[in-house]
Amino acid sequence: MAAATVGVLLRLLLLPVVVVVSLLVGASRAANVTYDHRAVVIDGVRRVLVSGSIHYPRSTPDMWPGLIQKSKDGGLDVIETYVFWDIHEAVRGQYDFEGRKDLVRFVKAVADAGLYVHLRIGPYVCAEWNYGGFPVWLHFVPGIKFRTDNEAFKAEMQRFTEKVVDTMKGAGLYASQGGPIILSQIENEYGNIDSAYGAAGKAYMRWAAGMAVSLDTGVPWVMCQQSDAPDPLINTCNGFYCDQFTPNSKSKPKMWTENWSGWFLSFGGAVPYRPAEDLAFAVARFYQRGGTFQNYYMYHGGTNFGRSTGGPFIATSYDYDAPIDEYGMVRQPKWGHLRDVHKAIKLCEPALIAAEPSYSSLGQNTEATVYQTADNSICAAFLANVDAQSDKTVKFNGNTYKLPAWSVSILPDCKNVVLNTAQINSQVTTSEMRSLGSSIQDTDDSLITPELATAGWSYAIEPVGITKENALTKPGLMEQINTTADASDFLWYSTSIVVKGDEPYLNGSQSNLLVNSLGHVLQIYINGKLAGSAKGSASSSLISLQTPVTLVPGKNKIDLLSTTVGLSNYGAFFDLVGAGVTGPVKLSGPNGALNLSSTDWTYQIGLRGEDLHLYNPSEASPEWVSDNAYPTNQPLIWYKTKFTAPAGDDPVAIDFTGMGKGEAWVNGQSIGRYWPTNLAPQSGCVNSCNYRGAYSSNKCLKKCGQPSQTLYHVPRSFLQPGSNDLVLFEQFGGDPSMISFTTRQTSSICAHVSEMHPAQIDSWISPQQTSQTQGPALRLECPREGQVISNIKFASFGTPSGTCGNYNHGECSSSQALAVVQEACVGMTNCSVPVSSNNFGDPCSGVTKSLVVEAACS
């Protein structure tokens, strides 16, 4: 390689460092961000960028720096976030950018870490967020029609978009000002549904593009899932795979704004997850096929605090099986394996930005892509096996390569494989749930649970029916969202009838009451007592509840409590999707029926306890009763207790097992809706999900037949030294003595590396040079600062089987394995053990061997 070529290569390799340094310098110089057909271009240099979504209101300001640093350590260049209109302008014209809503602080935190920002303004965001991120007051603007060529909507959308842009400009946060924002997005996945709006939809889309460009941010704008996005906007791809995506112009780069790292959880659904091997395969295929910007949706999902969930029926946890979990801990092996993929991609960056891809077939379902400069000085290659069943052996550049099914091998020098997406070098972490001496294995959470059974509880009864002076009486049944404006989840429908005893809808004192509702949850009370309840689901929120009721001579009171569980957030005209009791409401018996749908109904928005702010411990209320014999398993009741925060700095959650459905507040801050009685279906889950073959949201599910969510995150910043307050509103009935606080702890770290694995990616210092001559190695590292490897629970070199926490020796096993690993690892914060017969002896010649280790840290 000529000296000049080496110099160019070194400059390209050092470019990310230069960018990081420039961002960390206080008032950084302005950057010129453009694009060409290959990549985003920053100050004249094409960049291969890896991005990840972190939504600022789904975590806390105290968590942001750690989340961002873990993202950087995982190999990200960019943090992507939506902007959530509803939290910033809950009341029209009154803006809020404080606390978890402090967008400027979040963007500055990203800049402080030396990363870029992609700001997705929308302002429609979907995001499984309540009403798609729109404030509900927008629905009541006269003459408005959402997301179409409607002047009222466009005026409001432009006003808020300008507010966001002006706020960013005012803080100097665009790259054109020396800030970290290099990209912005207008609208969101509109192309998925724009056909429903006809010509007006196309006109609106073009208007939105023009409006965005006119704001003069100095950085490119994108539209995702919009194949006809007009120039200069870049149309981008969202999905599980985007390697086959092509931009709508030869002048635009191939960009992937949402690579779904898992899937969201719904109340009543099983827990979805996406294997690390498949996610890595999708990423590598995208860069192989010409992509240069890829974003994980989500990289950290976080928590839907308060009433922010959309859906309806989106769960409070927005973990998303992301590389950083809901609590801010790295999820292994996903985080580590993707980190290795990113390092491999970055080793290829000089070739990816300097050359056009050249594709060739290596046989059935196998493909080589080469990026090579005209003078052959720089070359990188990707070898893919897209067969979902069979491993392949291929010839490339005179060498033989083995390609596992559904995998990509990355060769930064067109010769040496530094990574194969199906071969994980990263460690696995497991945990266990310990509760008062019992121990249950769990692959996600380790939770030490001090019970609240002996805590002193106060309670307050929430009255049934109408108690407020501002109640409204009208004939007929009113749609819920138009009535409440989403001020509360709850709307009471109340009426009464007089019974003589000979009515045709009676059978003695019995009758059947039928209530039809758009959802989402319905409870029927007759004369103050619960007579029946029903719920919809994520697939259909509709309710048709028929329940036997007992009526008494004289006046009978009928109270219906309709409850929303997040407003619709996706689809054409999603803003018009209603909720609440629509009728008929009908009493029926053997000789006739009485339709109550058109009678006078009295409506009350929200609960008495909400008006009294019972969730706020700083506001005293005479409603609270302190009694050791507090009621349990009773609907419509508030509970309150005091607790001391769990010691240490481990992430905290509350286990709501034993409760029904409700909402919880810690020191006055809502940690979200809880619903541990909503169970996943009994079927559809798999013990081990095969990563090979196309992934879908229902392919890999776990926890069938179990509650969708029992653990609810309490950020440490919500807690205070000494005494803390926990308040619950319980809608269905439960026993608060069964509630427990939990802290998340890792119990084991494991790794499984074979002789066929590439060497650790960290051993490569350039596309052509490795710092070591050794082959594959097994690496372990304790997850927390200050920990050391204290115990080797299992070690086997040969043909071991099983999974972390449940390994077994195979027929072939080295007798030296445990001693060798103990010598290398015990007492160390991290260790690396060569996977070679030279290290362990050869227990079975001619057989491909693996090293498996399970260790504990303390």
From Swiss-Prot:
Residues 772-858 form the SUEL-type lectin domain. It is found in: Secreted, Extracellular space, Apoplast. Its EC number is 3.2.1.23. Optimum pH is 3.5. Its main location: secreted. GO terms for biological process: galactose catabolic process; plant-type cell wall modification. Keywords: Apoplast, Glycoprotein, Glycosidase, Hydrolase, Secreted, Signal. Residues 1-30 form the signal peptide. One of its GO terms (cellular component) is apoplast. Pfam families: BetaGal_gal-bd (PF21467), GHD (PF17834), Glyco_hydro_35 (PF01301), SUEL_Lectin (PF02140). It catalyses: Hydrolysis of terminal non-reducing beta-D-galactose residues in beta-D-galactosides. Glycans are attached at residues 32, 259, 482, 507, 595, 830. The active site is at 189 (proton donor), 258 (nucleophile). GO terms for molecular function: beta-galactosidase activity; carbohydrate binding. Releases galactose by hydrolysis of plant cell wall galactose-containing polysaccharides such as galacto-xyloglucan, pectic galactan and galactan (in vitro). Belongs to the glycosyl hydrolase 35 family. This is Beta-galactosidase 6.
